[in-house]
Design a protein with these regions (language model features):
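Polybasic/polar functional segments that serve as interface/processing modules
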Residues: 1-133
Length: 133
Protein backbone atom coordinates (compact mmCIF):
# COMPACT_ATOMS: atom_id res chain seq x y z
CA UNK A 1 0.00 0.00 0.00
CA UNK A 2 1.31 3.45 -0.96
CA UNK A 3 1.72 5.78 2.01
CA UNK A 4 2.38 9.35 0.91
CA UNK A 5 4.71 11.72 2.67
CA UNK A 6 3.22 14.44 4.81
CA UNK A 7 6.09 16.91 5.07
CA UNK A 8 5.63 20.43 6.42
CA UNK A 9 8.33 23.10 6.36
CA UNK A 10 7.84 26.27 8.41
CA UNK A 11 10.26 29.18 7.94
CA UNK A 12 10.53 32.64 9.51
CA UNK A 13 13.26 34.94 8.30
CA UNK A 14 14.54 38.17 6.84
CA UNK A 15 15.31 39.09 3.22
CA UNK A 16 16.81 42.20 1.63
CA UNK A 17 15.29 41.87 -1.85
CA UNK A 18 11.57 41.31 -1.18
CA UNK A 19 9.14 40.66 -4.04
CA UNK A 20 7.55 43.97 -5.02
CA UNK A 21 4.77 42.71 -7.28
CA UNK A 22 2.27 39.91 -7.56
CA UNK A 23 3.81 38.92 -10.90
CA UNK A 24 7.26 38.44 -9.35
CA UNK A 25 5.92 36.38 -6.46
CA UNK A 26 3.73 34.22 -8.71
CA UNK A 27 6.75 33.44 -10.92
CA UNK A 28 8.76 32.56 -7.80
CA UNK A 29 6.06 30.06 -6.78
CA UNK A 30 6.03 28.48 -10.24
CA UNK A 31 9.79 27.96 -10.12
CA UNK A 32 9.63 26.57 -6.57
CA UNK A 33 6.91 24.08 -7.50
CA UNK A 34 8.99 22.93 -10.46
CA UNK A 35 12.12 22.50 -8.30
CA UNK A 36 10.40 20.30 -5.75
CA UNK A 37 8.33 18.31 -8.24
CA UNK A 38 4.79 19.15 -7.20
CA UNK A 39 1.61 19.65 -9.22
CA UNK A 40 -0.31 22.96 -9.20
CA UNK A 41 -4.09 22.66 -9.00
CA UNK A 42 -4.84 26.38 -8.39
CA UNK A 43 -2.83 29.58 -8.45
CA UNK A 44 -0.43 30.87 -7.63
CA UNK A 45 -2.30 33.89 -6.37
CA UNK A 46 -0.63 36.89 -4.75
CA UNK A 47 -1.88 40.22 -3.46
CA UNK A 48 -0.15 43.29 -2.08
CA UNK A 49 -1.71 44.74 1.08
CA UNK A 50 -1.10 48.45 1.59
CA UNK A 51 -2.41 48.72 5.14
CA UNK A 52 -0.35 51.07 7.32
CA UNK A 53 1.81 49.04 9.67
CA UNK A 54 1.06 45.80 7.82
CA UNK A 55 2.36 46.57 4.32
CA UNK A 56 3.46 43.60 2.32
CA UNK A 57 2.66 40.83 -0.09
CA UNK A 58 0.97 37.49 0.50
CA UNK A 59 1.00 34.60 -1.92
CA UNK A 60 -0.37 31.08 -2.02
CA UNK A 61 -0.37 28.17 -4.39
CA UNK A 62 -2.63 25.14 -4.05
CA UNK A 63 -0.88 21.91 -4.92
CA UNK A 64 -2.24 18.38 -5.33
CA UNK A 65 -3.09 17.57 -1.68
CA UNK A 66 -0.56 20.23 -0.63
CA UNK A 67 0.03 23.96 -0.43
CA UNK A 68 2.65 26.70 -0.12
CA UNK A 69 2.24 30.21 1.24
CA UNK A 70 4.41 33.20 2.00
CA UNK A 71 3.80 36.51 3.72
CA UNK A 72 6.40 39.29 3.31
CA UNK A 73 6.31 42.52 5.30
CA UNK A 74 8.40 44.92 3.21
CA UNK A 75 8.02 48.21 5.13
CA UNK A 76 10.92 47.18 7.37
CA UNK A 77 14.49 46.45 6.31
CA UNK A 78 15.43 43.73 6.10
CA UNK A 79 11.93 42.55 5.24
CA UNK A 80 10.44 39.87 7.46
CA UNK A 81 8.73 36.83 5.93
CA UNK A 82 6.85 33.74 7.04
CA UNK A 83 6.69 30.74 4.70
CA UNK A 84 5.23 27.28 4.83
CA UNK A 85 5.17 24.35 2.44
CA UNK A 86 3.11 21.23 3.03
CA UNK A 87 3.69 18.45 0.53
CA UNK A 88 3.26 14.78 -0.16
CA UNK A 89 6.34 15.00 -2.42
CA UNK A 90 9.91 14.53 -1.27
CA UNK A 91 11.76 17.81 -0.74
CA UNK A 92 14.42 19.21 1.57
CA UNK A 93 14.61 22.44 3.55
CA UNK A 94 17.82 23.30 1.66
CA UNK A 95 15.96 23.25 -1.67
CA UNK A 96 13.48 25.81 -0.37
CA UNK A 97 15.97 27.99 1.53
CA UNK A 98 18.26 28.15 -1.50
CA UNK A 99 15.31 29.15 -3.69
CA UNK A 100 14.38 31.93 -1.26
CA UNK A 101 18.00 33.08 -1.17
CA UNK A 102 18.45 33.04 -4.96
CA UNK A 103 15.47 35.34 -5.49
CA UNK A 104 15.09 37.41 -2.33
CA UNK A 105 18.60 37.52 -0.77
CA UNK A 106 17.97 35.61 2.44
CA UNK A 107 19.79 37.14 5.42
CA UNK A 108 18.68 34.87 8.24
CA UNK A 109 15.99 32.32 9.00
CA UNK A 110 14.85 29.75 11.48
CA UNK A 111 12.97 26.69 10.28
CA UNK A 112 11.30 23.47 11.34
CA UNK A 113 10.72 20.44 9.15
CA UNK A 114 7.86 18.28 10.40
CA UNK A 115 6.55 14.82 9.50
CA UNK A 116 2.75 14.94 9.77
CA UNK A 117 2.19 11.34 8.65
CA UNK A 118 0.93 10.07 12.01
CA UNK A 119 -1.44 11.55 14.56
CA UNK A 120 1.63 12.78 16.42
CA UNK A 121 3.71 15.34 14.56
CA UNK A 122 7.40 14.40 14.44
CA UNK A 123 10.14 16.98 14.15
CA UNK A 124 12.45 15.73 11.40
CA UNK A 125 14.90 18.62 11.59
CA UNK A 126 15.20 22.28 12.50
CA UNK A 127 17.82 24.90 12.10
CA UNK A 128 19.01 28.39 11.47
CA UNK A 129 20.21 29.86 8.19
CA UNK A 130 22.57 32.83 8.23
CA UNK A 131 23.95 34.58 5.16
CA UNK A 132 27.68 34.27 4.59
CA UNK A 133 29.41 37.63 4.52
Amino acid sequence: MFVPNHLHLLVKGYITNPPKSETVLNQWFKELVNKVGMVVVAGPTSVYVNELGNEGITGTVTLATSHASIHVWDAIHPSMFQFDLYSCSEFTPDQVLNHINEHFNLQSATWQFIDRNDMEFKLIDSGKWVAEH
